[in-house]
């Protein structure tokens, strides 16, 4: 009205609307300018998903999914903000300017600096002469819905730019772009407080609400803007083990090199395969299922000698048993006697063994049955070698 008091109007933020355009441009740029092969690949984006009545290409599928989740987040943020405003019912700082109460009709003197007058609670429905819609909006201040929507929009967009785009050559491009996206939301909060439309606590609560919803959707719903791995049945532990990379053993390579050509193709399998359920004893334990990487029974590889450690003593070879001499009727001229050549038969038997220690060992084991040695074994422990010989 001319010459009258200016009318207050409700303000709306259009920042959330620009996010649709930003995500659309980002997906189009990603479709026409794909990432180089050296970049981290995205699983499952090369498959065209076909539904009951239509087919979705990977760029269209990503665009619909990201924008759909963003729209769902906008509705969720609006519901949370409206619920908080209705429950709390805190008035805005400019509530009296919007309400325009008629103090004369209400029987209340208008407040003045000289005479503030007593406080009085007014519950009359017609106490406000302003626009009913503006009055209803001025009664709901906490949390600030505009701040919540702006915070949600810029947080979603900043995370999209950070997680999707790959920029080479400079590390400040993405941080600068994210800060440029966060500035409008901050300015909206400052304007709401400067124009006395909201308190600073209302704006802060709106920022926290919008940022929390955006972070939850990006992290748990769209999985950081990456595609899910192809869904399927859960692999068993044995199938998971069979798909794991294997490492060839040097002993297996040596066995393959020593095997004939006909058996070499079966000796070393490419990967471990689950065998039939059986009971296997391994270090004193029973294992119900065993995974074997051995070759078939038709092809056997030679054993590779185990390298001996330096600390292990080398076993001495056992002497071969000597045949028992044939019983003789008398002293033969070829066998030496007790005093030299031509001696008794017992002296000839003693010369068959080189040392007294081996002679007594054979006597104990029964391989050299001689009455002379059985009788003289006990004195050997206490006598010298010259005395026994």
Swiss-Prot record:
Protein name, as recorded: Phospholipid phosphatase-related protein type 2
Transmembrane parts of this sequence: 14-34, 66-86, 147-167, 176-196, 203-223
Example GO molecular function: phosphatidate phosphatase activity
Compartment(s) where it occurs, according to its Swiss-Prot or TrEMBL record: Membrane
GO biological process: phospholipid dephosphorylation; phospholipid metabolic process; signal transduction
GO (cellular component) term, any one: plasma membrane
Organism field: Bos taurus
Nucleus in keyword set: no
Residue numbers of Phosphoserine PTMs: 236, 249
Region (Disordered): 255-280, 295-351
Record membrane topology: Multi-pass membrane protein
Gene (UniProt): PLPPR2
Any matching Pfam family: PAP2
